[in-house]
Swiss-Prot record:
Species: Drosophila melanogaster
InterPro entries cross-referenced by the UniProt entry: P1/P2_N_sf (IPR038716), Ribosomal_P1/P2 (IPR027534)
Basic and acidic residues biased stretches: 87-97
Protein name stated in the entry: Large ribosomal subunit protein P1
Subunit structure: P1 and P2 exist as dimers at the large ribosomal subunit.
CC per GO annotation: cytosolic large ribosomal subunit; cytosolic ribosome
Keywords assigned by UniProt, alphabetized: Phosphoprotein, Ribonucleoprotein, Ribosomal protein
C-alpha cells in the first residue's frame, strides 16, 4: 500500500508544481480525494514537508543534464575531465579503424 501512496503523492505534487501552486499537505490531499485515491493521513504532509523550499521544476530540468543541484563551481572540473575522455574516444576509433583494416588484409572476408 505504501508504494501506491507514495506514487500518488508524487503525482499530486507534480500536478501542483506544474500549475505553479504551492505544494501543501492540504492541496495534495485535495487532489488525492478528487482522484479517489486513499492514502494514510501522514503521506501528504510528509511530501509537502519534503518539497518545502525545493524548486521542483529546476530539479526535473537538471536531471537530464546529469548535473543535478551541483554548485556552479563544480561544473568547470567536470568539463575539464570530459576533454580527456573525448581524446580517448578518438584514440579508440583510430584503433578500431586499424583493426578493421587488419581483418581485410587476412583475407577472411565474408564474400571472398
Amino acid at each position: 500500500m505504501s508504494t501506491k501512496a507514495e506514487l500518488a503523492c508524487v503525482y499530486a505534487s507534480l500536478i501542483l508544481v506544474d500549475d505553479d501552486v504551492a505544494v501543501t499537505g492540504e492541496k495534495i490531499n485535495t487532489i488525492l480525494k478528487a482522484a479517489n485515491v486513499e492514502v494514510e493521513p501522514y503521506w501528504p504532509g510528509l511530501f509537502a514537508k519534503a518539497l518545502e523550499g525545493i524548486n521542483v521544476k529546476d530539479l526535473i530540468t537538471n536531471i537530464g543534464s546529469g548535473v543535478g543541484a551541483a554548485p556552479a563551481g563544480g561544473a568547470a572540473p567536470a568539463a575539464a575531465a570530459a576533454a580527456p575522455a573525448a581524446e580517448s574516444k578518438k584514440e579508440e576509433k583510430k584503433k578500431e579503424e586499424e583493426s578493421d583494416q587488419s581483418d581485410d588484409d587476412m583475407g577472411f572476408g565474408l564474400f571472398d
